[in-house]
């Protein structure tokens, strides 16, 4: 039997070497397989999919507010750590989430995930900040316009959506990156390990920095009178945040 198999596979193993034909040496390799992860401590909730988000808050009357762009400036102080899951979408900049963004995230993730082995939860509240707008061709004046829609402010460093379950990061990274690419601010898919590695790398860059002319030193010493063009936010955040934008390469 083995002789017949060798005759059948011999033409398939022949490759041209110079002007002659030769057989490739057949050898058996030893594979080192990684251990299969066990998800014994993972529990799937009763409703694993993302819930529907209301377009407007359910309150009797909403007061019109000024722009207040400080709600998307600087680093986030809430929803920066994992709670139940192991994977999430991390915001790398500030911005506003409209109701359409919530629907895009909900439909894409719910259609791509396996509800028997995965679950997803929101880490941002429903739209609550009113945005006013006047009609096209309307004359100036007449007070503030009527409320047009509602948004959710998001700061840099906040987790937008969190996922978990009996799965690995490679299984969810594809559609999480697809969702992150469509958000109105810079974002990326991360896991617990990658998020911790990002923070350690940033700390190591600051600790091993060889350039003595850092932003903090220049601003603190008021070199060339730079204080007159800096804001208090620049002194607090050491120049790493420029409005809603986050600059991780600045040390």
From Swiss-Prot:
CDD domains (alphabetical): Ribosomal_L16_L10e
Matches recorded under InterPro entries: Ribosomal_uL16, Ribosomal_uL16_bact-type, Ribosomal_uL16_dom, Ribosomal_uL16_sf
Keyword Ribonucleoprotein annotated: yes
Keywords: Mitochondrion, Ribonucleoprotein, Ribosomal protein, Transit peptide
Cited Gene3D superfamilies: Ribosomal protein L10e/L16
GO CC, alphabetical: mitochondrial inner membrane; mitochondrial large ribosomal subunit; mitochondrion
GO biological process: mitochondrial translation
Keyword Protein transport applies: no
Main location: mitochondrion
Transit peptide range per the UniProt entry: 1-29
GO molecular function, one term: rRNA binding
Annotated SUPFAM superfamilies: Ribosomal protein L16p/L10e
Subcellular locations according to the entry: Mitochondrion
A family per Pfam: Ribosomal_L16
Domain of life: Eukaryota
Quaternary structure, from the entry: Component of the mitochondrial large ribosomal subunit (mt-LSU). Mature mammalian 55S mitochondrial ribosomes consist of a small (28S) and a large (39S) subunit. The 28S small subunit contains a 12S ribosomal RNA (12S mt-rRNA) and 30 different proteins. The 39S large subunit contains a 16S rRNA (16S mt-rRNA), a copy of mitochondrial valine transfer RNA (mt-tRNA(Val)), which plays an integral structural role, and 52 different proteins.
Record-stated family: Belongs to the universal ribosomal protein uL16 family.
Annotated protein name in UniProt: Large ribosomal subunit protein uL16m
Species classification: Eukaryota, Metazoa, Chordata, Craniata, Vertebrata
